[in-house]
A protein has these predicted regions:
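A structural signal for short loop-to-beta-strand junctions that line the ligand-binding cleft
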Residues: 111-112, 119-120, 151-187, 217, ...
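N-terminal secretory signal peptides
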Residues: 1-32, 41-49
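Hinge/lid segment of periplasmic solute-binding proteins
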Residues: 127-180, 204, 210, 231, ...
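Extracytoplasmic "Venus flytrap"/periplasmic binding protein-like
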Residues: 85-155, 162-164, 187-198, 299-301, ...
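Glycine-centered hinge/linker elements that transmit conformational signals in sensory
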Residues: 207-208, 253-288
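Periplasmic solute-binding protein
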Residues: 133-137, 159-196, 222-252, 350-356, ...
Length: 463
């Protein structure tokens, strides 16, 4: 490790080693390094010598890089929309953002962090991963990067709490999702005299009617690389809160009830009514496991329709409009609210959100994080569709069509709102849930074994 040569410096080598290790791991700015060194008791000259010994620059180039790296899961039309968000930032600042998309974000981030070549910024699909990375000291606290007064006026406290760890803000919630939406083609429903279901039993009855006509009522796909299974987890979470209510949901998330509890088993079984329904999904179960969630969303809107209903969050609208550019909202595509299972919890929804985190500390990162947090930046994607802003100052009128506006209104008016269960559980439990659901889709008779396996993981993870 780097050593100081000034005999007057009375700083422990352990403290210096920790600072150097943190610098090499996190890549914070020269200024931050100097400030932290001097806080340890080093003189300015000794701090500068130490910085040079670790490969730090003596000029401000590293503080103001003209190119930033950003890692995300967004590909296809989602990445196109994000590039549209970033374009004005590059025009205004001259800072280019190199975007890398991967379905295996967890694995790639782990490798990059170990190799000390982490991206400048990452966009994580859930706050659970943010909590894990913050605990590992792999993230930069945002309190000194953003105007906290502005952030507090733009974001509800609940979102800021979710983005915090040990009292510091580590994440800006950027793209939210209302996960209480079931997608369908109104024209097909009208021509076939199908009524949108209000209750779960109504939906099962409709599904059986469609299947009885030799058609497939549902499309479903859970393939997503190393995250395969998450769309099924969204199903289960949405069912659970509608079936057992918010208090039991919180106990489930906190592992105050075991995965073998009847409430959890019931939620899996209700999901199984769709996934394993007779003549419900073409080619099931193999097709469910092999089909990507984006491709599965197209079914109700193909001609002729390959299916009649598809469940996933309101970001599905972006998939539909990108694939079928001539379709008109409300006339050709729409959603109905997730059907009521228990009248006591009518209207309950789950939500998700993608979060912006900083993995290096420099002025360019600071500028991009500040920009992405603004209503103006988020409104760009809002107007393109398939995006729900977390910044509360984006007006509903900015949403491009009545379907998107209805989803936002549904989200703000929902009597019960819970964050997607897997997304706020420990990451190893989330992974166990995903893989367990894949096994359940393939082998429904193995449900008890699946739940016992997830419980074994949870028993260790929550200690």
């Amino acid at each position: 490790m780097a050593q100081t040569n000034d005999p007057q410096e009375q700083v422990s080598q352990e403290a210096i080693d920790e600072l150097v290790s943190d610098y090499q791991k996190r890549g914070f700015s020269r200024r931050s390094f100097i400030q932290r060194s001097m806080a340890l008791g080093l003189s300015l000259s000794a701090a500068s010598t130490l910085l040079a010994a670790c490969g730090g620059s003596s000029n401000s180039a590293n503080d103001n890089p003209k190119t930033l790296s950003l890692l995300t899961t967004w590909g296809g039309e989602e990445q196109d929309s994000f590039k549209a968000v970033v374009a004005p930032f590059t025009d205004q600042t001259g800072i280019k953002v190199n975007i890398t998309a991967t379905r295996d974000l967890d694995a790639q981030l782990t490798i990059q962090i170990r190799g000390k070549n982490q991206p400048d910024i990452a966009i994580l699909p859930n706050p659970g991963k943010m909590q894990q990375l913050a605990a590992q000291h792999s993230l930069i606290a945002l309190n000194d990067l953003v105007d906290m007064g502005k952030i507090q006026s733009d974001y509800a406290k609940s979102w800021l709490d979710l983005g915090s760890y040990n009292g510091k803000l580590y994440a800006i919630f950027f793209k939210a999702a209302n996960k209480g939406t079931v997608w369908y083609n109104p024209g097909q429903f009208k021509s076939n005299n199908y009524a949108t279901p209000a209750t779960w039993q109504d939906m099962i009855t409709l599904s059986n009617t469609i299947a009885g006509q030799g058609k497939f009522p549902w499309s479903m796909g859970v393939e997503s690389g190393s995250a395969s299974g998450w769309p099924a987890a969204d199903w289960v979470a949405q069912i659970f809160v509608n079936q057992s209510g918010p208090d039991m949901y919180d106990k489930w998330v906190a592992h105050q009830i075991p995965w073998t509890d009847a409430s959890v088993k019931n939620a899996f079984q209700f999901f199984g009514q769709i996934a394993h329904g007779q003549h419900y999904i073409k080619g099931a179960p193999a097709s469910i496991l092999a089909t990507g969630f984006t491709d599965a969303s197209y079914g109700p809107f193909q001609s002729p329709p390959a299916s009649y209903m598809f469940y996933l969050g309101d970001f599905t609208e972006g998939f539909i409009t990108a694939q079928f550019k001539s379709l008109k909202p409300e006339t050709d595509f729409n959603f109905f609210p997730f059907p009521t299972i228990n009248d006591s919890y009518k209207g309950a929804i789950t939500v998700g959100a993608d979060v912006v985190v900083a993995m290096r500390n420099n002025n360019s990162v600071k500028k991009l994080v500040q920009y992405l947090a603004t209503a103006d930046a988020q409104a760009i994607w809002v107007k393109r569709g398939g995006f729900t802003a977390v910044n509360k100052n984006v007006p509903v009128s900015d949403y491009p069509d009545p379907v998107a506006q209805a989803s936002v209104s549904m989200l703000t008016a929902a009597p019960i709102v819970k964050y997607g269960a897997g997304d706020v559980m420990p990451s190893q439990v989330q992974q166990a849930m995903w893989s367990g659901l894949l096994k359940f889709i393939q082998s429904p008779d193995q449900l008890d074994t699946v739940l016992s396996g997830i419980e074994s993981t949870a028993a260790t993870a929550y200690k």
